[in-house]
Amino acid sequence: MFVSRLAASGLLLLALMALSLDGKPVQQWSQGRPPGPPIPRLVVQQWSQGLPPGPPIPRLVVQQWSQGLPPGPPIPPLVVQQWSQGLPPRPKIPPLVVQQWSQGLPPRPKIPPLVVQKWDPPPVSPPLLLQPHESPAGGTTALREELSLGPEAASGPAAAGADGGRSGSKAPAALHRLSKSKGASATSASASRPMRDLRTDGKQARQNWARMVNPDHHAVGGCCCGGGGGGARRLKGLVKKGVAKGCFGLKLDRIGTMSGLGC
């Protein structure tokens, strides 16, 4: 209620102020400075008509502009025909020149086959040759000769002494032949010794491998039985008794025991 009363009183005051000031601002502006002098009619007419027009163009000049510039001299018919036909054609290329361009440049000379054949093939390395001490065949042959000549070499001097009177002429020849064969067999045996040492199927290689695998058993066997043979026999006995077992509890065969291929 109080707010509405304040609003009504404010509106009433505004209405009273408007009634009291009604017509006073308009009269104040109308009573201000006097207006400037009015524009005379002549000036108004001058601005409306614009600048005075220039002198009129005489009729002769008007006709001259309408007709344009005087035409030039007419082109003679010969010149007209020349432009219609265009420029005279150029001289034709002779047939010989046309054929030369169509054929193009002469082909380059081909490389003779002799130059192609001059390329040498790549060098081929010679095959590797085995030395006498690396030849497995020589070592086997030397081993066979040594084994075959062993008893004869042992019994050769004794037999020669016993049968000296009987075969006097044949004994020196036999001794000479025996010495030659012994020398050859010794040379071949010394040459094939590395190959025999590298072979894994020999008795000595098996004994060495057995010593490497089970040094304790071989040490005991060597003391009791004397040598590597006792150790090898000791190992075989242990295998037979079932001491040596595989990875999965199975018995090891001879190859697995000696070479370590059981697992």
Swiss-Prot record:
Residues 24-30, 42-48, 60-66, 78-84, 96-102, 114-116, 128-130, 137-241 form a propeptide. The modification Pyrrolidone carboxylic acid is found at residues 31, 49, 67, 85, 103, 117, 131. One of its GO terms (molecular function) is hormone activity. Expressed by the venom gland. Residues 181-192 have a biased composition (Low complexity). It comes from the Eukaryota. Residues 1-23 form the signal peptide. The record marks 86, 104 as: Angiotensin-converting enzyme active site binding. Disulfide bonds join 247-263. One of its GO terms (cellular component) is extracellular region. Residues 89-95, 107-113 are annotated as: Angiotensin-converting enzyme active site binding. It is found in: Secreted. Residues 152-171, 177-205 are annotated as: Disordered. In the N-terminal section; belongs to the bradykinin-potentiating peptide family. In the C-terminal section; belongs to the natriuretic peptide family. This is Bradykinin-potentiating and C-type natriuretic peptides.
